[in-house]
């Protein structure tokens, strides 16, 4: 029998709570309060009501005819549980490791960022996020507590417990946790990488009345603080002075009487290549659920024009999340994601064909287009009479610059990727109080199609006399499985114990086909297909298979909410490493003392939490070793015929395998050890939060290619060896203040500071005389050899430039 109930929801100050959810528990029957906090609902006799609102603690009450309900402010931030990996969690105030927590993602998602990496920018001490050129498809770089590897500080992203899983949409993010110290990241072992671990928790299906939400964000982006190259007049004066000082004759191209445009500024190249980029994000989410069955469906569309001309990035994403409670012990969950990604990108960093670098070197006297025929401009004169008179097109004024607008407009680099991820979880809980078993299986399938057309380039200083099309597609299959047993319980109200045991396994393989075409008679966009190429060459390639297995254990103990100890251990077996050396152990230990809970600490409203903590841990960097390192790999099977696919009749694929690098049976992964000392302080009724940390991170067994005394005639590359050590020491400070002005207005202010000293403590290589050698990076840049090098005792990748005594300020100083 049903009945109609009425009621009013207010806060502790007696003010109405507008929009509070009132739900008949176990059903989808519900409503929300009006502007006066009132509600009316038809429910079953004896029904249980669930009343909730953001920022307030939820309540469950038996339905009555007339109800007055007072919601209290939610103090869950004090009891907020921070996910630490593999189902383990700990109250934020009880943490003994150094982690950064972002729970205000609803605010962060409205920032003008196009990636999850961008959401982290400026939010956490010791976490540095930098953009990768103006290309909208470029993923920002993340460095946590300093660079520790020559092979890149790759960060491991773990989404809902699955390493490497995609994030359907930034709007789907519920919280982000950054494991900054090795003690917290050690539970991920060699997968942690040199950069650290970022844990993302997404929104899930939940119980409640059907709800439909739509979020949209629009904005613009501009490149700021751009480099200001010399104008044409300044470039001409610089050339005149440099040649005069060297006692040389000025080239004809820099003689205004012969090349009349060389001293006239006609193009601001930075202004030409950059634009105001428009971006938009749309997200639609539908949630419906009961106590036993809940479903959430979301769709997202993101589009970013990019701040560089003729670039874009688009994402379409569909996600389904469902939870099915079969009985009081067993729950099955499913998370299914489909992502479609399209982009048009451009090289931004290469020494000659990087669009931004080219704009810096392109003379200001050049034009984007030749005014006579509309072709792409250079620095040669457009007047044929001058060329006829002087017999030159003044290539010496052009140098080796490339028209950057040609790179942006005529080069056609297009990428389309489609991927599907499915994660199925089985949870069996509380058959024994506190005991839970979780089994998870993830499968992913990815297809990519890539196309890059490079036209003929006729700039006199850096020509490219042939065109080409690179086209490849690949398929990636991967699976991961995890089985975890956890036990959490409290004894005698003082002894809290948490135990975790887990095993994981993963497998990865990629197969692809690459075809290159060249000598296109017509470069029109509708003819940029391999069938129009003069000739083609094809390659078949395989990456993997790669397999890894891990064993994990974790033990946490706390006494009387004052003393906290946590120990973890992980052993990784890596299929890509030599058999005799394919495993490693990654232990960690943390401790914390909550001084504010001691009997001798006076109770007051000023200091709410005072805690000191210490941690030590070890992690590895498996990503620094290629998938096929120890195995002979399939040769790139190829054919080259006149504009045809597949070998001619009677011809076969090449089908042998080979080792391209000398194998080192003792090779192991790069390893980092780090210790951390920290203080956490909450004051003024938890409105002020302060965290201070000092850390020392040592990365050793760095992986480098052996180049010293390696013979070039052996036919294979030098073996990889473990040598060298990098230290990062630093201090971090994180501070935030949150408060309410009234029931409708609140504010939050935060700031952070970090100082890091990076040093190569052991270079690993030695010169013939026994002195420490140097790492010289990846060669030169625009004919400048090794502009950055690494020496023992110096920071990683330091600039090595020509020393000067300063600039002459007057003719008298020159004399």
Question: Each PLM stretch: what is its role?
Answer:
Residues 1-319, 324-326, 331-333, 339, ...:
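Short, small/polar-rich motifs associated with maturation and membrane association
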Residues 11, 24, 34, 370-371, ...:
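Acidic surface patches and DE-rich sequence motifs
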Residues 92-93, 187-189, 208-209, 223-225, ...:
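Switch/connector loops and helix/strand junctions flanking conserved nucleotide-binding motifs
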Residues 154, 280, 315-317, 321-340, ...:
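Extracellular/periplasmic, surface-exposed regions of secreted and cell-surface proteins
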Residues 209-211, 355-356, 360, 773, ...:
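An aromatic- and glycine-enriched ligand-binding surface/loop that stacks and positions planar moieties
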Residues 213-263, 514, 628, 738-815:
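Conserved small-residue
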Residues 245-265, 279-281, 352-405:
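Acidic, glycine-rich flexible loop segments
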Residues 343-362, 763-769:
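Low-complexity intrinsically disordered tracts that form flexible linkers/tails across taxa
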């Amino acid at each position: 029998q049903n009945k109609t109930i009425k009621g009013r929801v207010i806060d502790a100050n007696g003010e109405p709570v507008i929009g509070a959810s009132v739900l008949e528990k176990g059903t989808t029957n519900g409503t929300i309060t009006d502007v006066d906090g009132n509600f009316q609902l038809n429910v079953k006799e004896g029904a249980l009501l669930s009343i909730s609102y953001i920022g307030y603690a939820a309540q469950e009450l038996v339905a009555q005819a007339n109800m007055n309900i007072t919601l209290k402010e939610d103090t869950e931030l004090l009891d907020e549980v921070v996910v630490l990996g593999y189902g383990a969690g700990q109250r934020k105030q009880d943490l003994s490791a150094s982690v950064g927590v972002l729970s205000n993602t609803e605010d962060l998602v409205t920032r003008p960022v196009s990636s999850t990496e961008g959401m982290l920018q400026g939010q956490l001490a010791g976490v540095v996020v930098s953009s990768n050129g103006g290309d909208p498809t470029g993923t920002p770089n993340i460095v946590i507590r300093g660079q520790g590897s020559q092979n890149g500080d790759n960060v491991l992203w773990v989404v809902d417990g699955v390493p490497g899983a995609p994030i359907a949409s930034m709007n789907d993010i519920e919280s982000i946790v950054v494991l900054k110290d090795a003690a917290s990241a050690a539970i991920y072992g060699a997968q942690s990488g040199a950069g650290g671990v970022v844990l993302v928790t997404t929104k899930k299906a939940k119980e409640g009345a059907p709800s439909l939400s739509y979020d949209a964000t629009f904005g613009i982006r501009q490149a700021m603080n751009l480099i200001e190259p010399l104008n044409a007049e300044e470039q001409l004066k610089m050339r005149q002075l440099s040649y005069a000082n060297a006692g040389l004759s000025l080239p004809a191209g820099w003689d205004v009487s012969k090349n009349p445009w060389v001293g006239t500024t006609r193009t601001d190249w930075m202004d030409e290549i950059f634009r105001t980029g428009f971006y938009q994000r749309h997200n639609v989410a539908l949630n419906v659920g009961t106590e036993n069955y809940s479903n959430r469906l979301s769709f997202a569309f993101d589009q970013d024009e990019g701040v560089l001309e003729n670039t874009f990035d688009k994402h379409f994403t569909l996600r389904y999340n469902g939870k099915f409670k079969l009985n009081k012990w067993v729950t099955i969950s499913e998370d299914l994601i489909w992502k479609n990604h399209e982009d048009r990108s451009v090289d931004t960093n290469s020494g000659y064909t990087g669009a931004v670098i080219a704009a810096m070197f392109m003379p200001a006297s050049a034009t984007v287009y030749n005014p006579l025929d509309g072709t792409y401009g250079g620095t040669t004169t457009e007047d044929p009479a001058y060329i006829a008179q002087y017999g030159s097109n003044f290539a010496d004024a052009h140098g080796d610059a490339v028209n950057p607008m040609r790179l942006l407009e005529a080069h056609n680099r297009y990428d389309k990727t489609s991927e599907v991820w499915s994660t199925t979880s089985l949870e069996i809980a509380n058959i024994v109080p506190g005991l839970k078993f979780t089994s998870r299986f993830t499968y992913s399938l990815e297809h990519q199609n890539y196309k890059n057309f490079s036209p003929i380039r006729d700039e006199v200083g850096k020509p490219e006399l042939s065109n080409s099309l690179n086209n490849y597609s690949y398929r990636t299959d991967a699976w991961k499985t995890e089985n975890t047993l956890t036990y959490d319980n409290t004894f005698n109200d003082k002894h809290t114990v948490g135990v975790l045991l887990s095993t994981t396994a993963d497998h990865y393989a990629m197969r692809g086909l690459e075809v290159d075409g060249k000598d296109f008679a017509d470069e029109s966009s509708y003819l940029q297909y391999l069938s129009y190429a003069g000739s083609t060459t094809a390659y078949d390639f395989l990456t993997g298979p790669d397999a890894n297995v891990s064993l994990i254990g974790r033990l946490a103990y706390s006494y009387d909410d004052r003393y906290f100890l946590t120990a973890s251990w992980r052993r990784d077996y890596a299929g890509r490493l030599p058999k005799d050396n394919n495993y490693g152990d990654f232990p960690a230990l943390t401790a914390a003392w909550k001084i504010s809970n001691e009997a001798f600490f006076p109770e007051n409203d000023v200091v709410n939490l005072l805690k000191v903590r210490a941690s030590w841990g070890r992690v590895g960097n498996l990503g620094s070793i290629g998938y096929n390192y120890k195995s002979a790999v399939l040769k790139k099977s190829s054919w080259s015929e006149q504009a045809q696919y597949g070998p001619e009749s009677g011809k076969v694929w090449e089908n042998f395998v080979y080792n391209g690098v000398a194998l080192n049976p003792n090779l192991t992964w790069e390893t980092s050890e780090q210790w951390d000392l920290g203080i956490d302080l909450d004051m003024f009724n938890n409105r002020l939060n302060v965290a201070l940390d000092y850390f020392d991170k040592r990365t050793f067994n760095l992986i480098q290619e052996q180049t010293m005394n390696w013979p070039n005639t052996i036919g294979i590359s030098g073996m990889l060896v473990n040598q060298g050590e990098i230290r990062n020491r630093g201090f971090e400070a994180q501070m935030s203040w949150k408060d309410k002005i009234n029931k409708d207005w609140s504010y939050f202010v935060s700031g952070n500071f970090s100082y890091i000293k990076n040093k190569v403590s052991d270079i690993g290589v030695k010169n013939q005389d026994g002195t420490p050698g140097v790492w010289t990076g990846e060669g030169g840049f625009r004919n400048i050899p090794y502009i950055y090098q690494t020496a023992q005792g110096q920071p990683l990748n330091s600039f090595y430039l020509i020393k000067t005594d300063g600039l002459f300020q007057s003719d008298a100083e020159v004399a």
